[in-house]
UniProtKB/Swiss-Prot annotation:
This is Heat-inducible transcription repressor HrcA. The lineage of its organism: Bacteria, Thermotogati, Thermotogota, Thermotogae, Thermotogales. Belongs to the HrcA family. Negative regulator of class I heat shock genes (grpE-dnaK-dnaJ and groELS operons). Prevents heat-shock induction of these operons. GO terms for biological process: negative regulation of DNA-templated transcription. The gene is hrcA. The keyword Transcription regulation applies.
Length: 338
């Protein structure tokens, strides 16, 4: 990735300010209208005060350097992956110079403080809706969660409620039938002494000696050892409506994202954006993917992926993606301290 950026930077040094403006205009116009862009169109939608012949010469240079291409003779130009990468990098510079106050995104004030699953669902759907893309959000690994409290609540002579509360407000509850009268308050106290502060993984791996072979360990295993889908998704319908993608493209994407190692390879430091061929999969060259991690304090606990057509609004998508990652990190950091 760094090698690609280095090559792009070297090519950009060969462009003057006017040629950069022409390239920016071509990519923006193509993203908006999805039609090849002519030199005349560049003059119509920009403030570049040069002749059409000058713009055509600039476009020839941009084509030679691999930023745009001409699908057929007499047609306008279409940006290549390299041209789209230029546009994204330019928009990133602009977004850093503008105030965050103009980010028209819904806030997370309505987030239910005790239900991280709903928080992730809300975040995924919000991200998908605002970017018109397909979103995958990795759930925090249940095994890494610390147990905060165990509760035994008698509800009748024969039944009691067994509840385990973990970090982020994740709660597991089950009714159990009792055949004898015991001091449930004392048992609850002992369970809390043994389990509080330990991770779910430690319990499931049998690292608590005094629980080995007990009915409570089997109960805990059945309660918190249940399998959960690693990812939740949102926005597949957005790709189905995108005129630059075919059903075959979307089927290919859904097949590729089943590969856990592939998804992990997309994530780097901060927000990583891969466009077309940069993704490294032939079948995904029509896509762009944004990826990044969300945190609990300094520790990453999950990844977020946004897949769109590579003909997309990179400026908007980057800002919304960054916003969602920051809000998720704030939420999980604050709830872990409660």
């Amino acid at each position: 990735m760094r090698r690609l950026n280095r090559k792009n930077n070297e090519a950009l040094k060969k462009l003057n300010d006017r040629q950069r403006k022409v390239l920016y205009c071509i990519v923006r116009e193509y993203i908006e209208n999805k039609k090849p862009v002519s030199s005349q169109r560049v003059l119509e939608v920009s403030n570049i005060e040069f002749s059409s012949a000058t713009i055509r010469n600039d476009m020839k240079k941009l084509e030679y350097l691999g930023y745009i291409y001409q699908p057929h003779t007499s047609a306008g130009r279409i940006p290549t992956d390299k041209g789209l990468r230029f546009y994204y990098e330019e928009m990133l510079k602009i977004s850093k110079e503008t105030s965050e106050a103009d980010l028209a995104v819904e806030t997370f004030k309505s987030m239910p403080l005790a239900d991280p699953e709903k928080v992730l669902f809300l975040a995924g759907n919000l991200l998908a809706r605002l970017t018109e893309g397909y979103v995958l959000i990795e759930r925090p690994n249940t095994r890494d969660l610390k147990i905060l409290r165990v509760m035994l609540i008698p509800v009748s002579e024969d039944y009691l409620i067994f509840s385990i509360l973990t970090e982020f407000g994740v709660s597991k509850v089950t009714p159990i039938k009792t055949q004898e009268r015991l001091n449930w308050e004392e048992i609850e106290r002992q369970l809390n002494f043994l389990l509080r502060g330990r991770t779910v993984g430690e319990v499931l791996m049998g690292k608590i000696e005094s629980l080995k072979g007990s009915g409570f360990l089997r109960l805990i295993e059945s309660l918190i050892g249940e399998t959960v889908e690693r990812y939740l998704d949102a926005g597949l319908e957005n790709l189905l409506k995108d005129e630059t993608l075919t059903l075959e493209d979307i089927r290919n994407l859904l097949e590729e994202v089943k590969d856990q190692k592939f998804l992990e390879s997309l994530v780097g430091e901060g927000i990583t954006v891969r466009i077309g061929r940069e993704i490294g999969r032939k079948k995904l060259e029509k896509f762009a993917v944004f990826s990044g991690k969300y945190f609990k304090g300094e520790s990453p606990i999950g990844s977020v992926y946004l897949f769109t057509s590579k003909v997309t609004k990179y400026d908007r998508n980057h800002r919304v993606f960054e916003y969602i990652l920051n809000r998720l990190s704030e939420y999980f950091t604050s709830t872990s301290r409660r």
